[in-house]
Amino acid sequence: MTMKRCKSCGQSLSNEDRISQLPEALLLQILSLLPTKEVVAVSVLAKRWRFLWKMVPSLEFFYYFTNDLERFSYNVSKCLFSHQAPFLQSLHLNMNFGCDPRIMDFEILIGIAFGRQLRKLVLKVYSGDWFKFPTSLYNSETLETLELYHCILIDVPFPVCLKSLRTLNLHEVEFVNDESVVNLLAGCISLENLVIHQTTDLNVKTFTIAVPSLQRLTVIVEYYEEFSVFVVNTPSLKYLKIEGIIVDDRTCIIENTPELVEASIIDVSFKVFESILGSLASVQRLSLKVSLVEIFSLPPISNTFYHLTYLELSTYKPKWWNLLTLMLDTSPNLQVLKIFDFMTSQEQRPWEKWNEPKNVPECLLLHLETFVWTCYEGKLENEIELAKYILRNARRLKKATFSIIEINPDKRVEMVGELKSVVRASNSCQLVFI
């Protein structure tokens, strides 16, 4: 160990490599946070580090189309062959081809990774053409997480075998046909979490999600081409998020979700909204964002939400209170109600009146304890009367919070005073203004 002496104080200073003294497990964890190219580069810093990079459990590679593709493929293959950890925890390939992605043989690289008992594969492809994911790679004993992004074409002519796969994320990929969807999901017998984020897919007419083991499902759609039906048959599902299915000729059929506990429905068409709402009888927590739902004249709901205790309603449309009234009437055990009012007074129509229910909803009389209104404007009679109605009738209410948008101080004092003057049904109700 080299020793130097400080000129100012005469104390000895050490050039000791303190990082190398860290436990190997911690060093590997630190190295896992770096791109693999940098991990290999730092191996020259100390003798102990020379071979440590070969034990790093996670590898990440970036390719840009201006780089030498042949050299890139060679370096990735070399790293994979040199890998000495008990198994490969994750492999991230971020590829920007700018041209035809078929010029690179992914099958060999990913096949080597599978031979290292790969647990997680993340593949992101940016290209002017679609990259067809190799069918031979749909069979793995160890893969637990598969994330495919962007210009990837999925063609599965036969059922796959991904028996350890628990998380599948499909982001802006495209399927060849309906059968490819069915065959891919049918081979994922342990799948628990599925995320589908589509921006274009002209080939699939019926997107069938039939996975007995699935517990969490997120479907986000951001395109407007023809697309017939989403069919969901997931008897173990506990969480559901549906967003962006806004074209009226599209629908979503939820056939079997008896275990569903939480759901979030965002920006869907009226047809989809009507279809989904009747399938949520078992949910305990529900979030509704109704910016695109036609809620001027909602039909009656046949089922009652006996298990629903938590409701969030985000408002963007005139007459949104019709939906609120409907949900209050059909949720007898509701305990928490949160309103996010993103609609300004300029957007509302003063002639559209809120009609007080003929009978006070059971949830207000017996169960509602928490009421939150975010972005409360208090300018229109409708929202003022609705807020007063809840305060006057919620007998078990413990806390009512109003987040008031920025207004002049005098108007704020007047608004707060008006709500404070309401004779509350609950003597223990605390009013909070923020």
Swiss-Prot record:
Q: Which SUPFAM superfamilies does the UniProt entry name for this protein?
A: F-box domain, RNI-like
Q: Where is the F-box domain?
A: 16-65
> Which ranges carry the FBD domain?
353-403
Q: Which Pfam families match?
A: F-box, FBD, LRR_At5g56370
Q: Which InterPro entries match?
A: F-box-like_dom_sf (IPR036047), F-box_dom (IPR001810), FBD (IPR006566), FBL13/AtMIF1-like (IPR050232), LRR_dom_sf (IPR032675), LRR_FXL15/At3g58940/PEG3-like (IPR055411)
Q: Where is the signal peptide?
A: none
Know the name of this protein?
Answer: F-box/FBD/LRR-repeat protein At3g26920
Task: Supply the alphabetized keyword list.
Answer: Leucine-rich repeat, Repeat
Q: Where are the LRR repeats?
A: 69-95, 100-125, 145-172, 173-198, 219-244, 265-290, 315-341
Q: Fetch the SMART domains from UniProt.
A: FBD
